[in-house]
């Protein structure tokens, strides 16, 4: 009976890690053909933001210039002009396909991430008992660690998240999340998040040390500041 009680929270933890990912992947595969068909056949309007519109126009102009340059070095004939029109037509269709694939990717990834969020919310609402057990295990594990190890772990975590070299890591992480949700890459938004998010985390962490750690474990705060200095 005791083994069963101990096994249930572990099974719950494993399901939190793998089940949302598995269900969202299954959902994405099952909806991919339907979304592709809907977008390519029934979507009459094309929604472009400024970045996408500029990118597609630049690619089209570059393509047109290359094809015209290629034809300029040849003899002008009706056949060559016809080939030029066919080439522009084919590449235009290819650009449209690339744009459609990007839009389909956005819809699918955004939908699957919403599903993951709903599943995790359901876990937090209906799995309160298992979460309490897991929380008690984590607190017991942290309580058994020495203050030196705790201070070292805090220092390592803060250096990784808000240290001198952290902006590059945040840039990669935010860019990955941004891409995972299917949004178009935007350097201005990503750089803005990279410059503000670590500052907010640093403020929250210092407030947490001041309000919580000073009251619970003053010795840990002393060791942490000694290591940090």
UniProtKB/Swiss-Prot annotation:
Q: What job does the chain carry out? A: Contributes to K(+)/H(+) antiport activity by supporting proton efflux to control proton extrusion and homeostasis in chloroplasts in a light-dependent manner to modulate photosynthesis. Prevents excessive induction of non-photochemical quenching (NPQ) under continuous-light conditions. Indirectly promotes efficient inorganic carbon uptake into chloroplasts.
One annotated GO molecular function is:
antiporter activity
Family, per the entry? Answer: Belongs to the CemA family.
Organism of derivation: Guizotia abyssinica
A GO biological-process term: potassium ion transport
Q: Tell me the keywords, alphabetical order.
A: Antiport, Chloroplast, Hydrogen ion transport, Ion transport, Membrane, Plastid, Plastid inner membrane, Potassium, Potassium transport, Transmembrane, Transmembrane helix, Transport
InterPro entries, per this entry?
Answer: CemA (IPR004282)
Q: Which spans are transmembrane here?
A: 7-27, 107-127, 189-209
What is the recorded name of this protein?
A: Potassium/proton antiporter CemA
Look up the record and report any one GO term of the cellular component aspect.
chloroplast inner membrane
Signal peptide, first to last residue: none
Q: How does it sit in the membrane?
A: Multi-pass membrane protein
């Amino acid at each position: 009976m005791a083994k069963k009680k101990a096994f249930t929270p572990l099974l719950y933890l494993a399901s939190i890690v793998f089940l949302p990912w598995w269900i969202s992947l299954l959902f994405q595969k099952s909806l991919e053909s339907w979304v592709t068909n809907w977008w390519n056949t029934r979507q009459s309007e094309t929604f472009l933001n400024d970045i996408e519109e500029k990118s597609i126009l630049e690619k089209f102009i570059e393509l047109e210039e290359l094809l015209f340059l290629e034809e300029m070095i040849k003899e002008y004939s009706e056949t060559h002009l016809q080939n030029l029109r066919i080439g522009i037509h084919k590449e235009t269709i290819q650009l449209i396909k690339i744009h459609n694939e990007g839009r389909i990717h956005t819809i699918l990834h955004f939908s699957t991430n919403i599903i993951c969020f709903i599943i995790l919310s359901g876990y937090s609402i209906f799995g309160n008992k298992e979460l309490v057990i897991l929380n008690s295990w984590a607190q017991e594990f942290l309580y058994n660690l020495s203050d030196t190890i705790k201070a070292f772990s805090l220092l390592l975590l803060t250096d990784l998240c808000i240290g001198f070299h952290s902006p590059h890591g945040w840039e990669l992480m935010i860019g990955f999340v941004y891409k995972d949700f299917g949004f178009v890459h935007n350097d201005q938004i990503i750089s803005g998040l990279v410059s503000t998010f670590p500052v907010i985390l640093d403020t929250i962490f210092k407030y947490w040390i001041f309000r919580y750690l000073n009251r619970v474990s003053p010795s840990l705060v002393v060791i942490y500041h000694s290591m940090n200095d």
